[in-house]
Amino acid sequence: MRLLAALCLLPLPLLAEGTQGWYQHNLWVRLDERWSVGNYLDLRLEDGLRETHTWIASPRVRYDVRPDLQLQLNVSFLEAINADETARADWLRLEFEVKPTFRLAEGWTLSFRDRLEWRWRDGGDDFGFRLRVRPQLDWTLRSQGLFRGLYASNEVFYDFDQDRCTENRLIPLGVTLRPGERTELRLFYLWRTTRGATAWQNYHVLGALVSMNY
């Protein structure tokens, strides 16, 4: 009976409030050996891809300190539904990122995106700070062809005003493709957990990230 009960309870952590589809697009233009400018677009759709949950537009500037260390400054304009799924708001974010990369072994790379965000809501006095830390492990299997490798990542959100973690995004498995010389496509499954005022919300996410570099 205990074994049967355990098997019945096993799927409970996998239950989710809904499924989302994310389409993300990165465009970078290199100005010289160190400086690049770009733009990031993000569209997130709710259950059955019927309703827009979030959209983001974000012009960016990147500076390569070394081949294995980048600094980045973003200004993001977005509209999103809150964690409790009760209200929609416009946000303006100023973001500073530190992005180190470590070569672990042949074909294995560990990278981090550490981001500090200053956030304003609806252009008013609602202002706050948030920290996001995302380690990512890439496994490169091929240097040519469409399929290039696999990756996994986990991102933690910490809100300084609430003094607690408010979101987690786990990608247990993603696929890296190279459809063109300057284009990379990442397809992923993401388990998203957000913390509202009274409870955690969970979502299954299927996503695609297109990156173009010139």
Which stretches of residues belong to each language-model region?
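Residues that define the transmembrane beta-barrel architecture of outer-membrane proteins
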Residues: 19-21, 53-55, 90-94, 125-133, ...
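Outer-membrane beta-barrel "beta-signal"
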Residues: 98-100, 177, 202-214
